[in-house]
Amino acid sequence: MNKKTNERPVFPFTSIVGQEEMKLSLILNVIDPKIGGVMIMGDRGTGKSTIVRALVDLLPPIDVIENDPYNSDPYDTELMSDDVLEKIKKNEKVSIIQVKTPMVDLPLGGTEDRVCGTIDIEKAISEGKKAFEPGLLAQANRGILYVDEVNLLDDHLVDVLLDSAASGWNTVEREGVSICHPARFILVGSGNPEEGELRPQLLDRFGMHAQIKTLKEPALRVKIVQQRELFEKSPKEFKEKYKEEQNKLMEKIINARKKLKNIIIKYELLEKISQICSELNVDGLRGDMVTSRAAKALVAFEDRTEVTPKDIFTVITLCLRHRLRKDPLESIDSGYKVQETFKKVFNY
């Protein structure tokens, strides 16, 4: 059974001109959500939110338990709410429906209660029940959580989002009452670097960092304007034109997810990734792990079996540029340092 919703038409992902760096980062995160999300920084009006919304249309629908606010997975106990788990244990019948992969927008003025959910303490004390009103993290479970202008969001709230994205769980505690529910989502943040960067400690926790720039070539700019006009004139007709390409890309993503666990990366390549991280003075081991994961996701996407140095070169800038130590007044490196170190280590 499908849940029908009236949704505004979304610009097709395969019709988007340029911005390959951002598109690749998003696709790799969809193939392997354990990469840890993506931070997209770029000028205003460069299509950041358009591309993120377009991505959701490429994702296959998911099976959920009907009327469950957490998008519980009927087949995976790790992705079930306590209520659903209780019903399954008691062999109670649950209704399964199919819905689009959820995408949740976090508004800039969002509060912690709105994001995490709230506990009705009075009801909990008077009736002895855990009265919980789920928040945006519950809605985003098994989907994408998009935060535009994440660099303007309160640091504490960004921390909460990153904690949930990393652990796959959201825990709310009030007055000794505690609620825990699955919150496994891909975190996508975007912002304009002119309005300030995130603190390095928070930035480091995003798996990848894509930079998006205003296209300079007149021919490409004209093409974008024309496509936008055609889409606004007749969204259905425009989407139909790209239907075959969209389906092919969706199929590639589904196949890549299945192949991912069988992708091989040789020990010497892992060693060289770590050598690059070490020479760049990257703190911690996140950079090493994310680069390896992203390279494997790329190989799966391209329907191959083994990671090559070229695959690492393709993804390593996206995985490391935001982890380099820098002067507070400097902007994030475009990738020159990472690429030069890669070439030196790999004799590339």
Swiss-Prot record:
GO terms for biological process: chlorophyll biosynthetic process; photosynthesis. GO terms for molecular function: ATP binding; ATP hydrolysis activity; magnesium chelatase activity. ATP binds at G42, D43, R44, G45, T46, G47, K48, S49. Disulfide bonds: none annotated. Its main location: plastid. Its EC number is 6.6.1.1. GO terms for cellular component: chloroplast stroma. Pathway: Porphyrin-containing compound metabolism; chlorophyll biosynthesis. InterPro entries: AAA+_ATPase (IPR003593), CHLI-like (IPR045006), ChlI/MoxR_AAA_lid (IPR041628), Mg_chelatase_ATPase-isu (IPR011775), Mg_chelatse_chII-like_cat_dom (IPR000523), P-loop_NTPase (IPR027417). It catalyses: protoporphyrin IX + Mg(2+) + ATP + H2O = Mg-protoporphyrin IX + ADP + phosphate + 3 H(+). It comes from the Eukaryota. CDD domains: AAA. Keywords: ATP-binding, Chlorophyll biosynthesis, Chloroplast, Ligase, Nucleotide-binding, Photosynthesis, Plastid. It holds the Pfam family Mg_chelatase. It is found in: Plastid, Chloroplast. It is an enzyme of class 6 (ligase). PANTHER family: MAGNESIUM-CHELATASE SUBUNIT CHLI (PTHR32039), MAGNESIUM-CHELATASE SUBUNIT CHLI-2, CHLOROPLASTIC (PTHR32039:SF9). Involved in chlorophyll biosynthesis; introduces a magnesium ion into protoporphyrin IX to yield Mg-protoporphyrin IX. Belongs to the Mg-chelatase subunits D/I family. This is Magnesium-chelatase subunit ChlI. It comes from Euglena gracilis. The gene is chlI.
